[in-house]
């Protein structure tokens, strides 16, 4: 039977979890505030395809954060649970594979952001009428982003998985019973596609942001600035993910260190986007932090 790593200080591991708990709760507060405003004034904000996609992205972030708070990070950072769980699940089980829902949601979130930056690039280089076309295809884009990641995770869901020690706790690992691309390999593919798309579209947006074709130029420029700011964090987090998946760590401790650092990098793109949106979009910020019932545009 697998054994938990000895030597991890319970108080220190609980402190690590506590720090993550705090910034996740803060992030949830911002997400719920923005989602509430977007939903309440949907007739106004739904005119912007970017905000439709951001609405979905924010919901995905909430789901991932809740999953991390309740299960994933609890398993990772609370040593007393390690031995008990390894005793309860001494053998691989398909029940454990349910935890791969986190990776699936991360893949969906990355693809959604790809289309968010594509929207911004289209906005600065295409004619005004293209916005109507974008609004029509957004539902199809969302369906595509939801279904596409299943190509990389269906094997994990259908295969048995097991718990393996990780720092003071443990993580889940699939036994991979099918001859297909692994979750790690698919993660590298999705991350690479996202990084390339984000970099290309961000360069286009930066070069052409002053030539935005829209009636509400200030609104469109603020949304583009928000996408550019988020892009920095996405490129950083996904680059870390690729390095962690492809690099060969010299020791188990280094492997665990890079996995923990990669998880923290992804935490940034879970928590920061609503803060960025509120900082760079005046009308959205006003609607969130004050009583404002007028149907105005999200500057």
From Swiss-Prot:
The gene is srg-30. Its main location: membrane. The chain crosses the membrane at residues 18-38, 59-79, 98-118, 137-157, 189-209, 223-243, 260-280. InterPro entries: 7TM_GPCR_serpentine_rcpt_Srg, Nematode_SR-like. GO terms for cellular component: membrane. It is found in: Membrane. Keywords: Membrane, Transmembrane, Transmembrane helix. GO terms for molecular function: transmembrane signaling receptor activity. This is Serpentine receptor class gamma-30. GO terms for biological process: sensory perception of chemical stimulus. It holds the Pfam family Srg. It is a multi-pass membrane protein. Belongs to the nematode receptor-like protein srg family.
